[in-house]
Amino acid sequence: MMSLESLWLWTFAISFIVLIAYLIGTWNHDFFSKRNIPSLKTVPFLGNMGPLVLRKASFAEHSQNIYNRLKGYKYGGMFEFMNPVLVLRDPELIKMVTVKDFEYFLDHRAPISEEAEPMFGKNLFNLRGHRWKEMRSTLSPAFTSSKMKNMFVLVSECGKQLGEFLMECSRDKNKKTEGCKIEREGDLLTVELKDLYTRYTNDVIATSAFGIGCDSLKNPKNEFFQMGKDVTNFGGIRQFIFLGYLFSPRLMKYLNLKFLSSKATEFFRFLVHNTMDTRKTKGIIRPDMIHLLMQAKEGTLKSEENGETNGKIASKPKWDDDDLTAQAVLFFFAGFDTASTLLCFMSHLLATNPDVQNRLQDEIDQSLEENDGKLTYEAIHSMKYLDMVVSESLRLYPPAIFTDRKCVKNYRLPMEPSYTLEPGDAVWIPIYAIHHDPKYYPNPEKFDPERFSDENKDNIKPFTYLPFGSGPRNCIGNRFALMESKIALVHLLCRFNLKVVSKTPIPIKITKKGFNMTVDGGFWLGLEERTNQ
């Protein structure tokens, strides 16, 4: 039996350990209060990340809750675990940080280091300072209007394959769908769109960036598609690994926990290196990303500033093979997931708003009729209502729920309360929450493409619409993502009406199981073949 003295010692020891743990878990949580900055109440160790860790809220809901709790302030403080983060709510302040005073906020935060995860740490999003500027300049020529026009034919062919595949499935009830999530509900073809659209975007990236033909609609077991699903899976254990890097990058590096699977990493290494070697040996020149990376490696790529080639030859960069492969992985990730997610939400919004769908189909029909049934680069960019629908879809469901910046030199905020950010301080811009703020968008949950009409779009306050970020650090591939999304939608809507079915999630609820903008149970819709086509 334990003596009274032993019991007292154990009680003291446990109390002491709890006290030390509490002090460690809250040691910096007075960071904002000491600076007279409004901030949120915190929990030891978790800071303000508890709802995400415990899966009580989706990432979108979590960011919106933080934004709303700081209502009335131009900025305020929160904690990512034990790390202080300044949340910006004021559009003018966002403009200063992302554009006007960009030199003070040059970098993104990069919790996953190059040493811990080369394919993640070395990509354009995570590169810093001069290395980021050099890589951004290198990759920019891949996304000019002329390059988009050259790739349009390749992307449109993938869109055509998508439309024809669905027509075959609709007309042939016995057609094998090779693992596609396709069912029937009465006379309707019911489809899980996330699976369908990721097959499409996979093929788009494969052909336009790597020069590879996959046809994932008929052959979903191809390795390119399987690795794409692996790289873009932010659920399960990978979600907690990422949160672990936010909590303590050093600990995660010590534990050697990888964010990307070794299989996916080696696949992309081999793909990029092998493609480069083959092209170099056989003298193959193709206007795609691989060719640009080859030029960058050899130091023969013309640098580009502000979207125009300046004619100067860039000095040969000191990049290794992993530097180049990391950009290919980023391009694949952005094109694979961003466009497919946008297409899912856009299709859902059209199915649940048939008046908008009908008007968009009228515009598509008229454009195709004027161009002898052909979809051209010029035609798709002349469809104003299509652009309005896409813009409003991106407002409601932006691909990035938030973006961030890291201060690189002292910066005094020009607003009260006065505060000077120091190098290393983190800044958070809650895109999703701003897009859903009734102050900027009346009735923000309503799908209303008219917000972006020629008559109304000037009413949108600058720096409150940020679907692809803002300033020099915005998404480099946004024009490509928009183009591949519009092409798929046109090929679909010229053949089918989108219908709500029993499996369609109404209302949409963003999943709490990961960082991806997706829904539990999938994006199920019905496809009804148009009788007038």
UniProtKB/Swiss-Prot annotation:
Q: What is this protein called?
A: Cytochrome P450 9e2
Family the UniProt entry places it in = Belongs to the cytochrome P450 family.
| Chief place where the protein resides | endoplasmic reticulum
Q: What is its EC number?
A: 1.14.-.-
GO MF, any single term: monooxygenase activity
Q: What keywords appear on the UniProt entry? A: Endoplasmic reticulum, Heme, Iron, Membrane, Metal-binding, Microsome, Monooxygenase, Oxidoreductase
Write out the transmembrane intervals: none
